[in-house]
Amino acid sequence: MSSRKEWALIVSLLLGAILVPINSTMIAVALSSISHTYNESIASITWVVTVYLIVMAVTQPIAGKLGDMYGNKTMYLWGVGLFLIASLGCALSPSLLLLIVFRALQAVGGALLTPNSIAIIRHVVSEKRLPKVFGFFGLGAGLGAALGPFIGSILIDSFSWHSIFWVNIPFLAIALFTALTMFPQYKENKSDAPLDIIGSLLLAGSIVSIILLTKNEAPWGYTVYSVLILLFVPLFFRREKRTQHPIIDFALFKSSTFTNANLSVLLSNLMMYAVLLIMPLFMTNQFGLNTSNSGMALSVFSIFMSASNWVGAQLHHKWGAKKIIFLSFAMMAGANLLFLLLSSSHSVLFLMLSLILGGLASGVGLTSMQVSSLATVDPGMSGVASGIFSTFRYFGSIISSALIGLISGYHTLFMILFAVSIIGVFVSLGIKSDETARIEKNSA
């Protein structure tokens, strides 16, 4: 494939994929305006956020499987098209109920395009160039998530909250046009296996129950959701072990590299989201910073995270996945020690150094985690593997938000995050080099 076509492919995929994290974080600054428009309580409005997160978590592993069945390019196109239509629906919604429905459809579109864009890259980009391309994606996605609230606030101040959905449409239209006209032709090994409907429903029930448990505020909720988890999760595992065509092939986890790469991204995302969620409150309470200044300080974390993602991608072939992921968690341990010291310090310089180290740690290993998760998987299973990786990544953020809700006191939280980073150091030791991982794949 020529360099021109390859870059057309990458830009098209990135245009679609970058809008998913932007729309995930941009909505946060719009909740008050949406509440005023529909004259609804903030508790009701938060379902605009919650439904997006739930549907994304439920749909991603299924979307990866659909890509392997019907073609990753086909599912990517459906994802971009659905995201475009849903964005239009969100912008024009006359009621909160319809806005929530279109946000759910937006999440389905995002879930379809995210794992399938990764699978397409696996098919058409040479193995040697994969880390650099994934690094480019990580840089874009990281900046998208970091800049989402900033972009959203500018749009809302200049126009209205509807504009955060209108802005998606031209970019999605370009991505769709580019994908239809400039995508290179390549052979996809489509799976003839049928979709496991029962397994999909049990997986959905399991994930929804877990998410609702972490977000529960009702006194009866803990009992009800715990019972549902104890019902759905064992039934899902039993179904997947017995069916001939599982929605998640647990044989993939026989590879220690695949397992540890997915555990690594879960632990990494857990700590990253903990910083993003807790540090604004910490900086306000501990340092007396206002919302604007704490947001600017936190942007330092996001910028260094995105930059180190790119650096980690460049170093992947030179150092290998294990060393880079080990370095990532070791730096996270150092950052969490600094956060612990901040509990008794009021030095802004010390705060900035902590955020810089935390950002570097959160970004440098992401590309190696992604590449390692695919290294032991046949190309025909790339969609499923990418869906699993995305789901593990998402569950890290779910666990993080649950921890913050359950734990009182910054010192205790930073101690737990330090312990998580040490666990990550040991998990990284189970990741093999790319060459060893390929041998592991062939012998599986």
Curated annotation (Swiss-Prot):
- Look up and give the membrane topology term: Multi-pass membrane protein
Which Gene3D superfamilies does the UniProt record give?
MFS general substrate transporter like domains, Multidrug resistance protein D
The protein's matches in InterPro entries, at most eight in alphabetical order, are given as: MFS (IPR011701), MFS_dom (IPR020846), MFS_trans_sf (IPR036259)
In the record, what terms sit under GO molecular function? transmembrane transporter activity
Annotated compartments = Cell membrane
Q: Where are the transmembrane segments?
A: 9-29, 42-62, 82-102, 104-126, 136-156, 164-184, 193-213, 217-237, 263-283, 295-315, 324-344, 347-367, 387-407, 411-431
| Keywords of the record | Cell membrane, Membrane, Transmembrane, Transmembrane helix, Transport
What is one GO biological process annotated to this record?
Answer: transmembrane transport
One GO cellular component this record assigns the protein to is:
plasma membrane
Lineage, top-rank taxon, reads Bacteria
Q: Which protein family is it in?
A: Belongs to the major facilitator superfamily. TCR/Tet family.
Q: Which protein are we looking at?
A: Uncharacterized MFS-type transporter YvkA
Q: From which organism does this entry originate?
A: Bacillus subtilis (strain 168)
**What gene, per UniProt, encodes this protein?**
yvkA
